[in-house]
Each structure stands twice: as C-alpha cells, then as structure tokens.
C-alpha cells in the first residue's frame, strides 16, 4: 500500500513536468473526470496523472495523494488547502422503457407502487428524502446498492426509480426525470490539496484546472 500511494508531486516545486496523484470516489471519477482529464491532456501534455479511484478515505496528510476530489471537507485542515468547487445535484430518474411499462408517478404516494432503487448507506440522500415527505419504510426499496455508478446503470437498465446526477440524467435520452416537484438534493464538492499548493507549479496547475473544469459541471 505504501508503494501504491507514494507521494507523486516532485520535490522540484518549479518543475511542470512529472506526476500528480489525484483521488476521487468511483462515481465522481466515472461520471465527471474522464472528460475533464481528456481536456487536461491537451493543455498540459507534460503532466502525468495517477488517478486513484476509491470510496475509502485517502489520507493526504500521510502523502497518499496530492489532490482529493470529494463530497466531504477534511476535518483536519492542518497542512491541507480545501476549496468548495460547487454542488452535485441529485434528482429522481427512471428509464423511458420502465415508465412505459409501469407508468409515471404523479405524486409521492405513487412511489409505493413502483420499484425503487436505494443507496445502501446511513444518512445521506435517503434521510433528506424522508424529510421531504417521501414515504420511506422498511419495504420501500426493491433494490439496494452501495455503489452509485452501478445504481445509475440499474436506473438506465430499467430496474426502477433512483437518484442520479441531475446534469447527467437530463442529458441522457434513455432516462426521464420523475417527480420534479421533489427538491433537488445538493451535495457540496470539495477539492483538497497539500499545503505547498501555491509553491508547487505542477500541483497548482492541476488543482486550478480541476477547479475551473469541475465547477462548470456542478451547480
């Protein structure tokens, strides 16, 4: 593990060429980072990126990565610099063919007659939905999934209704937003880097690019 997560940023703070290690959750890396890094490779051909995709916490203080993209601001701010770059908007979606088979729900109570895909996690979107009046009970979910990427694939496949990234869903012709009266759930997204951010040219170049690019894809 120590070898896998060796600190990537060079000690030569003024050198643009070299490696930067970026960590992100599987869902964030799958949905938002490929296009971002495609653009990055065109503008910064000398910088290599090691993308660490994990839903586990990566310790920047222990130099396991140079930059982290995540839904939580690190609680230990010593020797780290964090910036809120936007909010990830979540809304309810279902596949077009699923709605053709089962009908489109017109109210929150209609959800009880549908197959709902839940996220197997404490708190988070499910608690917010319950607070909005969504009738979440013991038998509310037909499916539970602990992976947001797979959850989205299940929605697209027609397994049922579930939460997905608003911008992604609105641009996908295979799905349709349902119950738009349910308020959009907004999850803050943070970009965090080592404290030497402003002194390391390569680190700052990647950080600034991610900040500018991802903020345009978030709310």
Give residue ranges: language-model regions.
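Alpha-helical linker/hinge and terminal dimerization helices associated
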Residues: 1-13
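Central regulatory/effector-binding core of bacterial HTH transcription factors
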Residues: 17-77
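A late-sequence structural motif
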Residues: 181-219
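Amphipathic alpha-helical segments that line or abut small-molecule/effector binding pockets
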Residues: 3, 26, 30-42, 96, ...
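Short loop or secondary-structure boundary microenvironments that flank
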Residues: 26, 168, 193-196
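Short, well-ordered beta-strand segments
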Residues: 21-23, 68, 117, 162, ...
């Amino acid at each position: 593990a120590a070898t896998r997560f060796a600190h990537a940023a060079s000690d030569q703070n003024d050198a643009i060429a070299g490696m930067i290690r970026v960590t992100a959750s599987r869902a964030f890396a799958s949905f938002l980072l490929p296009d971002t890094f495609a653009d990055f490779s065109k503008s910064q051909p000398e910088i290599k990126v090691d993308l660490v995709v994990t839903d586990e916490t990566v310790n920047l203080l222990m130099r396991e990565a140079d930059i982290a993209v995540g839904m939580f601001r690190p609680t230990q701010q010593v020797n780290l610099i964090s910036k809120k770059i936007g909010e990830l908007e979540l809304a309810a979606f279902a596949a077009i063919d699923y709605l053709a088979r089962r009908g489109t729900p017109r109210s929150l109570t209609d959800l009880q007659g549908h197959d709902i895909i839940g996220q197997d996690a404490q708190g988070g979107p499910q608690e917010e939905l319950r607070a909005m009046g969504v009738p979440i009970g013991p038998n509310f979910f037909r499916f539970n999934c602990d992976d947001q990427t797979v959850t989205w694939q299940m929605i697209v496949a027609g397994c049922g209704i579930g939460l997905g990234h608003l911008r992604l869903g609105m641009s996908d012709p295979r799905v349709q937003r349902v119950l738009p009266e349910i308020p959009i759930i907004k999850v803050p997204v943070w970009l965090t880097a080592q404290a030497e951010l402003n002194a390391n040219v390569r680190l700052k170049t990647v950080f600034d690019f991610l900040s500018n690019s991802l903020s345009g894809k978030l709310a």
